[in-house]
Curated annotation (Swiss-Prot):
GO cellular-component term (any): cytosolic large ribosomal subunit
Keyword Ribosomal protein attributed: yes
Organism: Porphyromonas gingivalis (strain ATCC BAA-308 / W83)
GO terms for MF: structural constituent of ribosome
Protein name: Large ribosomal subunit protein bL17
Length: 160
């Protein structure tokens, strides 16, 4: 029976789990990316996503609810300032989990959890991929072949 299995208890009592998720959520908002285990990242995603949805409307009530989750006024300021502006048009899915491998000591699955709109590497690659065309690749490869052929013939003429 699946009784009391709605969320991962993470091997902790309720107060410890709430404090840990609150601290991890504040760190995620302040640093935009944190390194943790996959189980904690999945629990954090369930904890943070509704919180990020609440920040779309900046009211005193939503700020108080968010503060009850975070207990960190610096994270709250960052959340309602910079983060809320970036996620305003996104309908959900504010976090991304990138699995990195296994921890050396206990072989626990490790990962990065990050805010989607703050990964400059992935955003930059998407922009670069959109600008490339197939025709430009053919031209570059043709230019390289044309330049390489005369360079090989010149040393042979010098040897004779």
């Amino acid at each position: 029976m699946r009784h009391n299995k709605k969320f991962n208890h993470l091997g902790r009592k309720a107060a410890h789990r709430k404090a840990m998720l609150s601290n991890m959520a504040a760190s995620l908002i302040l640093h935009k990316r944190i390194f943790t285990t996959v189980a904690k990242a999945k629990a954090l995603r369930i904890y943070v996503e509704p919180l990020l949805t609440k920040t779309k409307e900046d009211t005193t009530h939503s700020r108080r609810i968010a503060f009850s989750y975070l207990q960190n006024k610096y994270a709250l300021k960052e959340l309602f300032g910079d983060v809320a502006a970036k996620i305003a048009d996104r309908p959900g899915g504010y976090t991304r989990i990138l699995k990195t491998g296994y921890r050396l000591g206990d072989n626990a699955a490790m990962c990065f959890i990050e805010l989607v709109d703050y990964n400059e590497n992935m955003l930059g690659e998407a922009a670069k991929k959109a600008t490339k065309t197939r025709r430009s690749r053919k031209r570059k490869s043709a230019d390289v072949v044309v330049e390489a052929a005369p360079a090989e013939e010149t040393p042979k003429a010098a040897e004779e």
